[in-house]
């Protein structure tokens, strides 16, 4: 049974029990209403009518018969409109869902292969990946060029070594004999440490020049005295020593002109550094004095401001101070 039928039945029963023509007295109204409510409750419980969820005025009116046909028609129209709106909303939602599905089908790749292709294209389009690809390509190119150069260099070096080996001939050492016809063994071994580090020569050119001058003076004195053999022997010793130094990799500094040049250069550099140092010292002292002066001025200013403030406060309180 519908709600309208239930209400109709209630109305008929009410009309049967209470005649329409008879008007109830004022005293019997509360008792009649009580009985009517009890009857309605019994009917509702018998027919198992559910409670309405919406507690609006329209829902209560649905259980009652309409007084006029117009109001009933209006309600029906409103219900029809609501139903139509619901159906329209459902149709719109269904259409939106179908469009979304179509778009997904278009966008989404059908196979894994297509998906991988799209991902690779996206990666290629991105700027960061393009930069990486370019840099990697350049690195590969550089590595290939280096590899080829190394190969060419190795081949050339091998050829050069082979040529040098062919050119090198074994040195035949001939024994040296003295006056007594005995073999003299050299005390100097030239190939003792061919790959060793070169020893550093004396660095101070002033001392080297002084030493050279002293030796020259000594040689001239010997020649003047008539000891030419001794002078020649000393000269040969010096020549041999220089030769051995050159073999060991030392720098032989026996040119007086170059030594004088080096001394002059050192003197100029020393002078330059001295002037720079004095300028730096003066600048440091000047900056120091400037900072101290500024600090002193700030301290004096602060003390003056403090005094002025105190004098002002005193004058405001009523003390007579000259100048305020």
Swiss-Prot record:
InterPro entries: Rrp14/SURF6_C, SURF6. One of its GO terms (cellular component) is nucleolus. The modification Phosphoserine is found at residue 87. Involved in a nucleolar function. The keyword Nucleus applies. GO terms for molecular function: DNA binding; nucleic acid binding; RNA binding. It is found in: Nucleus, Nucleolus. Residues 53-167, 264-324 are annotated as: Disordered. Pfam families: SURF6 (PF04935). Residues 115-128, 264-275, 304-324 have a biased composition (Basic residues). Belongs to the SURF6 family. It comes from Drosophila melanogaster (Fruit fly). GO terms for biological process: ribosomal large subunit biogenesis; ribosomal small subunit biogenesis; ribosome biogenesis; ventral cord development. This is Surfeit locus protein 6 homolog. The lineage of its organism: Eukaryota, Metazoa, Ecdysozoa, Arthropoda, Hexapoda.
